[in-house]
From Swiss-Prot:
Its EC number is 2.1.2.11. SUPFAM superfamilies: Phosphoenolpyruvate/pyruvate domain. This is 3-methyl-2-oxobutanoate hydroxymethyltransferase. It comes from the Bacteria. Its cofactor is Mg(2+). Mg(2+) binds at D43, D82, E114. GO terms for biological process: pantothenate biosynthetic process. Homodecamer; pentamer of dimers. NCBIfam families: panB, PRK00311.1. 3-methyl-2-oxobutanoate binds at D43, S44, D82, K112. Binds 1 Mg(2+) ion per subunit. It holds the Pfam family Pantoate_transf.
Amino acid sequence: MKTKLDFLKMKESEEPIVMLTAYDYPAAKLAEQAGVDMILVGDSLGMVVLGLDSTVGVTVADMIHHTKAVKRGAPNTFIVTDMPFMSYHLSKEDTLKNAAAIVQESGADALKLEGGEGVFESIRALTLGGIPVVSHLGLTPQSVGVLGGYKVQGKDEQSAKKLIEDSIKCEEAGAMMLVLECVPAELTAKIAETLSIPVIGIGAGVKADGQVLVYHDIIGHGVERTPKFVKQYTRIDETIETAISGYVQDVRHRAFPEQKHSFQMNQTVLDGLYGGK
């Protein structure tokens, strides 16, 4: 399993870091087999797995439950788990309690915290407590209401400077890595050049030190809309629907199960039970 030091070396050698989300055992197993460097158990599971409208309804218990499954499927991959909405905002004590629960119960290797101003102290507290932290700036889904929707961040001079400043402060607070979401490629390049920690992009251009995408987006599974920044490599929904439709039709017409799918009783036993009928 790669470690924090390995990711720093990858940045130094300009070897792109590959991160992918996973929310369950089979997805994690496939991700590890395919060779991803890191798995993110994102609170995006609220929308892509649980059918919620946003990430706001996801709980600490949800994150623990799904991370456990991912850990079983990818025991040799570095796993980052999101701290969900309001689990690190109320107090330092509350933040540490929630973080400890996630790490101890799920086996996560690091925790991801969204936001800059107001979150630096949480980053520092977790780092001092021995819990590696991945920061997340730009479009932060937990704060989408405050940001005015799912929009590109840092497009004007003032907000761009703020993102650079917050990125530096995240590193100074102890973050081992930074995720930038929906940020202009030029700004990402500047931030990646400025920081000594790896910068992982999602909708942030090719100059980031690595990339992360949502598992369901890249395989075309259960997604109604594909964001501009996503490259969809296949659409398994079509294959799945075809298979289920075939099953429905076979059952309706008694074409399934066939004899090869059934179990047979010994004739002697059958005779004893029903007189051979």
